[in-house]
Amino acid sequence: MNSPALPLSRGLRIRAELKELLTLAAPIMIAQLATTAMGFVDAVMAGRASPHDLAAVALGNSIWIPMFLLMTGTLLATTAKVAQRHGAGDQPGTGPLVRQALWLALLIGPLSGAVLWWLSEPILGLMKVRPELIGPSLLYLKGIALGFPAAALYHVLRCYTNGLGRTRPSMVLGIGGLLLNIPINYALIYGHFGMPKMGGPGCGWATGSVMWFMFLGMLFWVNKASIYRASQLFSRWEWPDRATIGPLVAVGLPIGIAVFAESSIFSVIALLIGGLDENVVAGHQIALNFSALVFMIPYSLGMAVTVRVGHNLGAGLPRDARFAAGVGMAAALGYACVSASLMLLLREQIAAMYSPDPAVIAIAASLIVFSALFQFSDALQVTAAGALRGYQDTRVTMIMTLFAYWGIGLPVGYSLGLTDWFQEPTGPRGLWQGLVVGLTGAAIMLCIRLARSARRFIRQHERLQREDAEAASVLGR
């Protein structure tokens, strides 16, 4: 008669874990939406200056955003390592770790900014950009390049606060950055308040300025809030330590490469579609923009799962870590069911929000169908990747991601969309079908990898427990 107690207990446990995940994920999601909104504001304000300015900003985005994701992705290892130390109750050990991560940011932030500053012109040349757009695009990119050092330092501090389970600072500063971006854009694009009239390139200098504001704001917050004092982050100082920075790079660089691979494949598909009819290009951009917006929620869940898995592993609870990953993936799938259903039902209305042109609406609506289809695989792969970051299992994840996107998705999409190898070329539909295949492949491989990693950690923990018990029994004799 007591059998119903177990399901009830499990149900309460699921609800408690889901509450923890959503509490972590909600501020992250708002911060990500604020960042996305900054890009939207840039596009609107540059577009009001002229189509020429908007084109320059769009070209610049195709260069700096993948590079930015590579840089910040490399620093994401800080979240998992801080989360594990926090879960283990090792607050004093967190400070030295984060200080070494800041040294790493001081290296790759300026280096990434220098690469963006000096290599943007050759990249634009390889892209065969119209000569009249090169100058404005370069000016736009140089403003952003000056903000890269601040962005790297900010992301380390953000990973630190997120790893402690404190996600509110990134939300507040994300909203603050958005609110500051608008007046700076207004001043630099249109030449108000005594500032030079820069047009679209002013967006880049505004973004670079906001990056510095967000870093200084996070630095002030972490330095003043009492919750962070136990880590003694700024009370001591050490030179760079290879023994600490090496593992950060070993875990973080594969994350950066995987994120770069995922973002760059969308850029490549945009370039492949760029040679087609302008209505096709517009429809593709609408579907892609809306897909990126919808992706923010499972992405935020994935970051929250990283923290929860890290906390549980640090506390010596590998079964709870696996449980947190499972609840996170179930929540992501539940969201995918809702988002996919709404996208299928409202695809034409969604497209009409972006354009009044019937031809563009028809193309965008047809592509949103494929976006709805990959909601499930996209939600699974990003949540599984977040859980694997919590396990600090990133190298194999990177290989799987590269293979899924570049070894499966892109070749399938290219074959179906732009060649007659299997049928008449279907244009953007074929390329989006390739995305569905690639994301599905990534989801399957990452879920299998996650199950194996979770099982391995549980076995290792149980083996250590048995060894400790045997050692204790020997000493007790």
UniProtKB/Swiss-Prot annotation:
A GO term from the CC aspect:
periplasmic side of plasma membrane
A GO biological process of this protein is:
response to antibiotic
Q: Where in the cell is it found?
A: Cell inner membrane
GO MF annotations in UniProt: antiporter activity; xenobiotic transmembrane transporter activity
Where do the TM regions start and end?
21-41, 56-76, 104-124, 133-153, 171-191, 202-222, 253-273, 286-306, 326-346, 360-380, 398-418, 431-451
**Keywords of the record:** Antibiotic resistance, Antiport, Cell inner membrane, Cell membrane, Ion transport, Membrane, Transmembrane, Transmembrane helix, Transport
Please verify whether the record's keywords include Cytoplasm. no
Membrane topology listed for this record: Multi-pass membrane protein
Q: According to the lineage, what is the superkingdom?
A: Bacteria
Question: Which Pfam family, an example, fits this chain?
Answer: MatE
Role noted for this protein: Multidrug efflux pump that functions as an H(+)/drug antiporter. Confers resistance to benzalkonium chloride, fluoroquinolones, ethidium bromide, acriflavine and tetraphenylphosphonium chloride.
Name the protein family. Answer: Belongs to the multi antimicrobial extrusion (MATE) (TC 2.A.66.1) family.
Q: What name does this protein carry?
A: Multidrug resistance protein PmpM
